[in-house]
Amino acid sequence: MFLLCAAAALGSPAHAQGFDIRTLFGASPTVTGTVSPPPTTPGTTPAAPASPAIQEWSGEPGASNHPLMTAEAIRDAANNFRGCLAALWPLAERRGVTRAAFDANIAGLTPDLRIMDLLDAQPEFTKSFWDYLDLLVSEDRIANGRSVLAQHRATFDAVEKAYGVDRHVIAAIWGVESNYGTQIGDRSVIRSTATLACIGRRQDYFREEFLSALEILSRGDVRPDHLKGSWAGAFGPTQFMPTSFKRYAVDFDGDGRRDVVSSAADLIASTANNLKKDGWIPSETWG
């Protein structure tokens, strides 16, 4: 997302003449590499600030006016939430999730209906480009980016060598997606993806995310108490969706787990692997 903002900023001399991603982090003004399509979809990370309590659903229909987003449809689906989850067991079993693990992960699970109010309210869709860019580029965030690059210099060296992806782009994604781990979200990924798999207008898409989240826990890559993130189920400092985690996450520190939440090495390398597999070309330049 930050890469898109930086590229768009190049076209506006009033706001960002000669804008370049490396200048944010004190590096030479040339960014190499292109990625197609851009990523969709965040050692130790700074402690996250306290988050406000999760609000209740407003009871209003979704802004999209989709038939599955009417207030009546949302209530009906919420009433059938447990039945919907039970119907997903055969799909989970095919992915290697045990019955015990499945039951444990859905035990007592209730839908987070507040998500229905958030589905069409993401800031990139509700703010102007420049207001949104102002949120992404600040002196504090730039300083934090430089600190991250210095703190993990050896890891960035190794990842650049292994994947050919520019460290400054990885650091920028880390900064945009979670402000360097300080804003990773505190919602249960299991609860969020289960809610969206059974309620609302994107059930087919989020069914895959929910099942993939169950697989992540079954493999032991991420601790259950660490699998927290955004209302949409993105988690970790560079905000992997569960299906993206399955495709791109790597165990770069060699501990047998692909932990993009707690391991800086896994986080940096997995983000680089995502870009590489999505078409990053080291020899190309832009900006």
Regions found by a protein language model. Name each.
Residues L10-A16:
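Sec/Tat signal peptide C-region and signal peptidase I cleavage site
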Residues V97-G287:
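Catalytic glycan-binding domains that act on GlcNAc-containing polysaccharides
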Residues A63-A73, L85-L88, Y132-R141:
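Acidic/histidine-rich, surface-exposed loop or edge segments in extracytoplasmic proteins
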Residues A16-G83, A100-D103:
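Compositionally biased, proline/threonine/alanine/serine-rich low-complexity intrinsically disordered stretches
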Residues A92:
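Intrinsically disordered, low-complexity polar regions and short flexible loop motifs
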